[in-house]
């Protein structure tokens, strides 16, 4: 048994799919099945859909070719017959079931046949039923819904018909023919978003306006052609209401597209952004390496007009500043320099601010450029500007800085006061000149301090804690607090005065200002507290009123209940009285009946007694009469 397992196993001649392996080996060319012999990769069609593609060497039989040709000929004949039928149908004189006229033509005939040339909707229906044979048997409500709906649609969609309000109340409107309608086939009304004649007129007017601007010699415009879907090209969008339009408008960038540039809208607008972004400039008009090559003289003049009109609307005008300085006892200070257009400031581009280190003779040094990035109140000791100036301070130099807010004013003397112990090299004449200069500068410090205060009060962006009030000479300074508060409260009733108490010195004017501001804030808090109390009192009054109303309602309900109880008691009392009366009547009747019965019994008794007496008497025998025998 084990030897039989050691023998070679017989090879299968068939696979699972029933294909003989010897036949497959004969097709391949050998008894074995090498994996790379006889099987070549075949190309496969990209679309393997039904019906399957025919092989390349397929030959059609003759009968199949004849049948295919016959079927193709029949199909061509049927298509030709259908085309002939369609042509005959198009040439027919009857386009609709009632004739060649459309609904709009029938309505036109109906309105034209009227004496007043106007008909109501019901009259149009009646004319259709009476004059068109097709609608004579379709006048009832069941069969007239379709064609009446078509008439209403044609009346509302065609331009040749217009609706006129009827004079009488509760009557339908009149339908008339529009005399301004175009002859021929009437055009249906479109939606408001589609391009109609009204939008075409607007587009024409806009193009004429652009041509007029071109002929007027407007400079700085792009050469782009107008877009067919927009009223104005991207490079020709101007703003006539702008004050800058008088001398030539801003140039728009060619990379900006329209906000709505589809074909369905012809009123596209452009974003009002300038073509070239301006670099940020200094706060007081110092340009930072910017050169405008497209700015013209007319444009600069327009900018000056704009800044002049804007300067008139500033909160602190020159007159108010003069009043403030007159009330405070300080000398008047000219306002900051006006804004100059960039073209006129090109000469000042390369002019940085300077720290004045005295002149060359007598030990003074030459002018040295100083950094432009200084804070608005750079005179305080906490400012980085003076720290930078201290590092470069030498015994032969006296550092004085110029305020960026007042470039034309004299240099300030804060550093001179701070560093008064600097030893100066030179003769006594230079010392005298220096003392005189210090006196002049000390007089001008007050004026500059007033301007600085005004700038800080009106500029919320600059924090007020940059002040170092201890370093300012406040010997002769005065402040009219009432006028200042009126000035602040005049701006839409907003009062915002924030002065930290830690930085305020013990000087009387500043302390009085702080006291007044704190008093005002306390009064405002008292006012808010009073308003809160008033609101709470109003709420309590409302609650009390609601309670009183509830009590009144309860009292009314109690009164109604009491009245109802009283009515019930009265009814019950009346009922009892009625019962008593009925009982008395019954008693009287009983008494009368009893008395009559007693009388009857008494009479009967007397009669009986009388009878007894009669029967109790002895009988008397009488003799018969004489004639009785």
From Swiss-Prot:
Comp. bias intervals (Low complexity): 342-356
Positions carrying Phosphothreonine: 49
Instruction: Provide the taxonomic classification.
Output: Eukaryota, Metazoa, Ecdysozoa, Arthropoda, Hexapoda
Residue ranges, compositional bias (Pro residues)? 332-341
Subunit (UniProt): Interacts with melt.
According to the UniProt record, which residues make up the DNA-binding region? 98-204
User: Is Transcription included in the keywords of this UniProt record?
Assistant: yes
Q: Which GO terms describe its biological process?
A: cell differentiation; glucose homeostasis; negative regulation of cell growth; negative regulation of cell population proliferation; negative regulation of insulin receptor signaling pathway; regulation of DNA-templated transcription; regulation of lipid metabolic process
Q: Which residues carry this modification: Phosphoserine?
A: 78, 193, 262, 265-266, 271
- State the name under which the record lists this protein: Forkhead box protein O
Q: Where is the composition biased (Polar residues)?
A: 224-233, 259-268, 394-403
Which GO molecular function terms does the record list?
DNA-binding transcription factor activity; DNA-binding transcription factor activity, RNA polymerase II-specific; RNA polymerase II cis-regulatory region sequence-specific DNA binding
Q: Which Gene3D superfamilies match?
A: Winged helix-like DNA-binding domain superfamily/Winged helix DNA-binding domain
Tell me yes or no: is Mitochondrion among this UniProt entry's keywords: no
What this chain does, per the record? Transcription factor involved in the regulation of the insulin signaling pathway. Consistently activates both the downstream target Thor\d4EBP and the feedback control target InR. Involved in negative regulation of the cell cycle, modulating cell growth and proliferation. In response to cellular stresses, such as nutrient deprivation or increased levels of reactive oxygen species, foxo is activated and inhibits growth through the action of target genes such as Thor.
Recorded coiled-coil stretches: none
Q: Which GO terms describe its cellular component?
A: cytoplasm; nucleus
Q: Where in the cell is it found?
A: Cytoplasm; Nucleus
The annotated region (Disordered) lies at: 185-208, 220-274, 321-368, 394-417, 563-597
**What keywords does the record list, in alphabetical order?**
Activator, Cell cycle, Cytoplasm, Developmental protein, Differentiation, DNA-binding, Growth regulation, Nucleus, Phosphoprotein, Transcription, Transcription regulation
